[in-house]
Amino acid sequence: MDAMNGSDVQSDGLPNGNTLQLAYHVMPRLVQDMGPSLLLIFGPLVLVSSCIYYLFFHPLSKIPGPKLAAISPVWMMKSLYGKKLNRDIKALHDRYGDVVRVGPNTVSFATVGALSSVHHEKAGGDDGTFTKEGTIEWLLGLMTWPAQNILTKTDVKGHARLRKAVQPAFSAKELRKQEPIEQEWITKFNRLLDAAAVDNTEVNITEHMSHLVWDMLSDLSFGEPLARSQLVKFNRLKWLACAMSPMLEVMQSILTFPIAGAFTRWIVTSFPQVFQLPRDILPTGTLRTTLERADRGHDFLSAIVGAQEKGIVLSQDELQSNSAMLVMVGQDATVTCLSSTLYFLLRDPQHMANLQDEVRGQFKSEDEINGLAIARLPLLNGSINEAMRLLSPANGTGTHRLSNGGFVEGIYLPAGITVAVDQYTIQRSPKYWRDPETYRPERWASVGEPESEFENDVHSAYRPFLLGPRACLGRELALQIVRLVLARLVFSYDLRMVNRDFVWERDCDSSYLWLGHKVVVKVQKRES
């Protein structure tokens, strides 16, 4: 009788999630008492009853979306298996509107209001907070890291502690100190392009930029570059995680049920660090050597260890986890941004010509190019912003949150509901942008100008680095690297895209990350 009290019924008379959970507690006992013949009878009945519940009585039953998505994770698994997640989710929003049900317990929003509600956590409180715990990213964190880091830490106070410890590595003062290291690596990168120009060979510039960013970020992190073989391991594991994404989607669905969810958690925690990723990328011996080296300069680790003077002490595992995470996350986001920006610039040579005019008109020599000067170039920054608007590096299931019970856009989401705010859709929505599907870098140069054709663009809809307490800490570092690489590239070289038949949205895989993007160019040294 207790199961039928008011706590299990919503205000609209429909049962809430507790009723379903009670059924899952009782079901195993019933199954034990059944013989095979009874299972044949009751099995289909249970299946039909479950479908009826999800379609008509579940808390998300009134939210539009594909019927297959409402009753099972198969729709999401199919999209992930097809590696077109961003495009598929946007198609659903185009068809059904700003709020779409994309799984039995998952709802996707495509509004600025939802972006703010979900990612602005209430200080110190659980009520109304949307957490990472129980999401796929949290699940991968349990399987991957020796200790939680600022990407995976779920509780508010624990995350604030780690963020405070890591923050000093990304201060404006540290960025200025780190620039000579960045410039040195870009000079080495340009020597490769010089050789390609002399030999008149085609260059997979995405691959070379990946090597550049890996060397640069690992040097900035630990005072010396990590081996390229570690980058190969990292890329292999990225592909593995994305290949496993359909199965991980099933596991996340199972986590919402008490018995099955508890069993899944037990399996995951019983085999910790399945991928051993941080120790593969940053061996413990390398970390120890870095910490003991007397000549440590302006690397991330020095800044993080320096935070101990403020009373924030990280364990060896926490140092390893956070240091490796900074390299790995920064690597993927920075390379994606560089590759996508060059892709758009070279698809329309006029865009590249306009940017070359700006950069070459501002500087007389490559030596004059520095972080402070290029931060003020409107078209350079507009070219980068526009690429990230159309192809946000952070979009995907990694930005999902789990509701603890709260409202988003006037819709109450009970505890246990997975909430997605789809940046890919928002940043391409005609509701917020003029000419939303077209690469228009000039829209950013005209911000604040009256009577501009882009004056009604809603810039709060542009959040490639997220917002709130979990906004990307390395945002300014990533932008500084991208600006420096592009500015020196367009100043010194003329590039022509060779693989012009490559279409990013059609040919790239999108699930947890963008995979498979490749820009191949012919390089010509700029005439004096």
From Swiss-Prot:
InterPro entries: Cyt_P450, Cyt_P450_E_grp-IV, Cyt_P450_sf, Cytochrome_P450_monoxygenase. Its cofactor is heme. Pathway: Secondary metabolite biosynthesis; terpenoid biosynthesis. It is found in: Membrane. Its main location: membrane. The chain crosses the membrane at residues 37-57. It comes from the Eukaryota. One of its GO terms (biological process) is terpenoid biosynthetic process. This is Cytochrome P450 monooxygenase btcB.
